[in-house]
């Protein structure tokens, strides 16, 4: 990680494969929290390149726990960082209530007071990775919820670091791009 950080400190960019490997290593616990926080901070100080974002996304998709609910529309838009009302979760219930099946993918709020998982948990939703249970939920209620850490190990690995930083990071862009249910 030291060489990677020096490269980034010199205003160089990561290649797609390099970014992919880095996120895989983060998920596998090969870097400590300080190193990961340093890496995240670099991308707070400069824009992430398309190659870097694609590499990180590739890693998330390769490591995800796939869910075959592909006949339904996945929704995940990421937080706005403004501590506003969690509109996307409310919209999912509105859409489901109108008879349109929805798969919501989300997490606890890292940069706001209420992520989708916070809202769902407060309403008694028990998070699961059991696809059969999700299918039953779709059949009965037109909605299924995918708690991101159950389906993306890398997101689980960085959750405490993101919570500690308490600012929007490139993971806010990655989550919606790496929904376990691909359209």
Language-model regions: role of each:
Residues 10, 28, 77-78, 108, ...:
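Short glycine-rich loop/turn motifs that provide flexible caps or phosphate-binding loops at active sites
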Residues 3, 9, 115, 172, ...:
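Residue-level signal for pocket-adjacent positions within structured domains
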Residues 13-21, 30-38, 48-55, 86, ...:
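Conserved active-site and cofactor/substrate-binding residues in soluble primary-metabolism enzymes
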Residues 40, 85-141:
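A glycine-rich phosphate/pyrophosphate-binding beta-strand-loop-alpha-helix module
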